[in-house]
A protein has these predicted regions:
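Post-signal peptide N-terminal segment of mature Sec-exported envelope proteins
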Residues: 28-62
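Amphipathic alpha-helical scaffolding segments comprising HEAT/armadillo-like alpha-solenoid repeats
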Residues: 57-58, 71-89, 110-123, 144-159, ...
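Structural detector for internal amphipathic alpha-helices that build alpha-solenoid repeat scaffolds
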Residues: 47-52, 58-70, 74, 78-81, ...
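Bacterial signal peptide processing site
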Residues: 21-24
Length: 402
């Protein structure tokens, strides 16, 4: 009986030690994320949305990653999937969140990160459009083409997307990778009239990268978007349509520039027009119609001190190494006309400093030394010391180039 009792006590002691982990405590490590676990509303990988809202990057890394110096593909995927818990506004901007902070921190800490393409199969199968969209944004930093194993499955998922956020993010971040793919181009075109304004907005961004067999339907779509009911859509279309280099776009761009209620779109509309005829620094474009529309804008009379748009004007305030060769072919350009228009704007005391400063540079590009020196009398009359200093500095810099 005593022998039996001794054996029983020995077995009990071994079992107790095993349960306690031996003589000392072992730090807890996170379980590997289970990709097969059933989704729970408001919860991702055991993290509830309420808890996520207060989590830091360190908290999230500690929760999901065993070795933060070398996260596995599964762990890295799980980390990206927590973006489902982040807040998102109507413009598809994520609020500051622990997911993004954690990914940035891992990178800045020098962790050995998995190839993000290796996360593709898991992420594109995720039911959350937010998660897929976020993944597309991360893929935007990676080059991959049809020689890459993941190209086909990623494209197949992208062109089947129906959720606005996933479509918009694919347009914004993946158009470069799929630029020559006929199916992707068809997918983009099919969404030109999407009810969501952000999809329509990023449609025009995608078009700047695409290389379809026929650009005509895309130009037609851009013509429609330049008259869209949403200002954000119009502004983005105005910025990007110049890359299409089609004179049919000149008239709607000029119409935007004639409307001071669309002043927020003037920067972009003027940028596109100038690209079509001046195209700094490449100097490869020669649209006479775009030049004439630009000059009409510069000669316009505007109530706002900020018009004409200084940022748009800046696109013709410098010249590249091909300027002389371009100028020899751009016979439609009248340097005297440009100088006169810029001079008139500069002499208008009601115009903002940035607008007037750009005009000095424009005269430096298209005028001669005498044209620049003629500005001195106006500068001498400027009452604001800071404005006068700014104009004088710019004038001196331009004169130094002559």
């Amino acid at each position: 009986m005593k022998k039996f009792l001794a054996i029983f006590l020995a077995i009990l002691m071994v079992a107790t030690l095993a349960a306690c982990g031996g003589g000392g405590e072992t730090p807890e490590t996170p379980d590997a994320p289970d990709a097969t676990e059933a989704p729970v509303a408001g919860e991702v990988h055991g993290i509830k949305v309420e808890a996520y809202a207060t989590m830091t990057a360190d908290d999230l890394i500690a929760k999901l990653i065993k070795d933060k110096t070398a996260p596995t593909v599964e762990e890295y995927t799980a980390l990206m999937e927590t973006i489902e818990l982040a807040e998102l506004d109507e413009r598809f901007n994520f609020a500051d969140n622990a997911t993004n902070d954690a990914l940035i921190q891992l990178n800045s800490d020098g962790a050995t990160l998995p190839n993000i393409l290796d996360c593709a199969n898991a992420v594109i199968a995720n039911d959350s459009a937010k998660v897929r969209a976020y993944y597309y944004s991360r893929l935007g930093n990676v080059f991959f083409d049809d020689t890459t194993a993941y190209y086909a499955p990623i494209k197949a998922k992208v062109i089947s997307e129906t959720e606005p956020i996933a479509i918009a993010y694919a347009f914004r971040y993946l158009a470069s990778n799929f630029r020559s793919d006929a199916e992707f181009c068809d997918f983009v075109l099919a969404n030109k009239d999407n009810e969501n304004f952000m999809v329509r907005k990023w449609f025009s961004s995608a078009v700047t990268f695409l290389q379809p067999a026929d650009k005509t339907p895309f130009i037609d779509a851009m013509l429609e978007l330049l008259g869209d009911e949403d200002v954000d859509v119009v502004t983005e279309a105005a910025l990007n349509c110049g890359t299409l280099e089609d004179d049919r776009l000149v008239e709607p761009l000029a119409k935007i520039l004639k409307d001071e209620n669309l002043a927020d779109a003037h920067d972009d509309a003027l940028t596109s027009l100038i690209r079509m005829w001046y195209d700094y620094p490449a100097h490869d474009n020669y649209s006479e119609a775009a030049y004439k529309a630009t000059m009409d804008y510069l000669k316009g009379d505007y109530a706002s001190a900020d018009l004409p748009s200084w940022l748009g004007l800046s696109k013709m305030a410098n010249k590249g190494t091909k300027f002389d060769a371009w100028a020899a072919e751009a016979t439609y350009v009248n340097n005297d006309e440009i100088v006169e228009a810029a001079k008139n704007i500069f002499e208008d005391e009601a115009k903002a400093r940035l607008v007037r400063t750009q005009c000095i540079s424009i005269i430096g590009v298209f005028g001669d030394k005498a044209d620049l020196e003629a500005l001195q009398a106006t500068i001498d009359k400027v009452e604001s010391a800071s404005d006068k200093s700014s104009y004088q500095s710019k004038l001196d810099a331009e004169l130094a180039k002559k």
